[in-house]
């Protein structure tokens, strides 16, 4: 059973789409192993997105991620990383397949509703960034 990190970004939290997005994950067969709402500090956002530090969009991304609360979740399921990315849709909501989260709730490449880990290795790093082992409820399977 794989785990992946999902973040419901400030735009979706602010527009009260949390429940709808969680329902999409659950109806897609994911189990939520951990979840919390928090307001990222500048330091937390910069640390989480440190891999993008040299990219031109870095500061805009940090500013957006600290603009309001986020919901951080550990999703668990078969092939979780790839399936989550499929359910989220393309980074650019205009290119996302109909029915995906970003097609439904995203506005632009920068304001695109959700974040999801892009690999198993990064999922482990990202999960550990936000959650301690005792906060994650593993399935009995």
Curated annotation (Swiss-Prot):
ATP binds at residues 9, 57, 85, 91, 102, 112. Keywords: ATP-binding, Cytoplasm, Kinase, Magnesium, Metal-binding, Nucleotide metabolism, Nucleotide-binding, Phosphoprotein, Transferase. GO terms for cellular component: cytoplasm. It is an enzyme of class 2 (transferase). It is found in: Cytoplasm. One of its GO terms (biological process) is CTP biosynthetic process. It catalyses: a 2'-deoxyribonucleoside 5'-diphosphate + ATP = a 2'-deoxyribonucleoside 5'-triphosphate + ADP; a ribonucleoside 5'-diphosphate + ATP = a ribonucleoside 5'-triphosphate + ADP. This is Nucleoside diphosphate kinase. It comes from Chlamydia abortus (strain DSM 27085 / S26/3) (Chlamydophila abortus). The gene is ndk.
